[in-house]
């Protein structure tokens, strides 16, 4: 069964809009787990635009399932990861001007610095995933530099429609199959929602899906537990019928 990691960054986005204490992403994470989330994901950005260091520290103490820390491969973030020891680290590209992560890592161009970062994190006993585009060259390079996992970027699939979306789906299927053949645990995420998730969840061998915005957006209307439960049910249906 494909696991569901729920990203609670957008809870923190609402809080930081007023620089106040609520809503609390820690409380949101607890409710997400009650709704069936298999893990919690947060992205601690260099500019601290949403998740704060305090959130990461408390989540590490209270989350009983997988805590996935998304981060850039900077010295500051590596040191934080080594100190907090999340259950896994996902290295992502990061630009100050972007609203959200816009694409996968340029693994080939950054392979030397990524290899060094991966080694430091893995030496502390923390598995490392790389957020990459559905390209075989990036998958091969991820394997070569020591990644334990990859997360296939589904943003282009999520943003497209019709024949273009079907083409993107085939790219993702090929990437997942190739990644698994190389021995990498393989996840997917970015832009997935209640209308497009089933085709991705049905891909054979996929380990997990990491979803944030669509779940939090629905949670505003129906509550976090129900929003997570509805997404979890869609994933289960897709896996059963695959």
Curated annotation (Swiss-Prot):
EC class of the enzyme, as a word: transferase
InterPro entries: Aldolase_TIM, PyrdxlP_synth_PdxJ, Pyridoxine-5'_phos_synth
Residue ranges of the TM segments: none
The protein's annotated pathway: Cofactor biosynthesis; pyridoxine 5'-phosphate biosynthesis; pyridoxine 5'-phosphate from D-erythrose 4-phosphate: step 5/5
Active site: 43 (proton acceptor), 70 (proton acceptor), 190 (proton donor)
Catalytic activity field: 3-amino-2-oxopropyl phosphate + 1-deoxy-D-xylulose 5-phosphate = pyridoxine 5'-phosphate + phosphate + 2 H2O + H(+)
Main location group: cytoplasm
UniProt key word Magnesium: no
The protein's Enzyme Commission number: 2.6.99.2
KW Cytoplasm (keyword) present: yes
Keywords tagged on the record: Cytoplasm, Pyridoxine biosynthesis, Transferase
Site residues, Transition state stabilizer: 151
Name of one Pfam family that matches: PdxJ
Compartments (UniProt record): Cytoplasm
Cellular component, GO, one term: cytosol
The protein's name: Pyridoxine 5'-phosphate synthase
Organism encoding this protein: Thermodesulfovibrio yellowstonii (strain ATCC 51303 / DSM 11347 / YP87)
